[in-house]
Amino acid sequence: MKIIKSIFVCLLLLCGLNGCESGTEINENSGQQIYNDIKGTYVGYIVVDNIPQKTKITITNDFSVSPLPLKPILARIFTNEADLAEALESVKSITLTTPITEMSIIDGFVYLFMKDIEWEANITVNGKMHKILATMEPLTQWNMSTNALTINIVVTDLICNSESYDVKVNKISYFVDSATRE
């Protein structure tokens, strides 16, 4: 899994170095047609605690994923099982949405670039309010020959009640391999 993620990130970096922007490609007829081909709803699985959980990814002018299981994020904050269970009861999952800002086409793959997503929630555990802020970076790749979508959402910052949690070394990452059109 780590190898796939590393390759995915390297390809995205390579794409960024080539400097393709949606403003130029999407306005061209072929680029617009490819972008239209990508639009739609896809179904894939995010693995949490070795259990695949079904998720939907929607691509329009925005990128949206729902539901996004919160256990990996909340488990970093609430290390006591009872507290974690209470936190998960109040917010089981979320929908993330962000605008698509760029598109690049390289060797049969389309890379969609989006703004980072900021998720904020107030969760009460044991009668105490916890203000949580998580910043996530979505990375998306669409295979032009198979029409399969691969996404990786990496939590880049995690804060609860002004306390920062380590997500740089001990990463929180959501990975969906080969989501298919619904």
Predicted regions span which residues?
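First exposed extracellular module after export/assembly in secreted or surface-exposed proteins
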Residues: N29-E182
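Enrichment for repetitive, rod-forming helical segments
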Residues: V9-L12, I159-N161
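Bacterial Sec-dependent N-terminal signal peptides
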Residues: I3-S6, L12-V43, E182
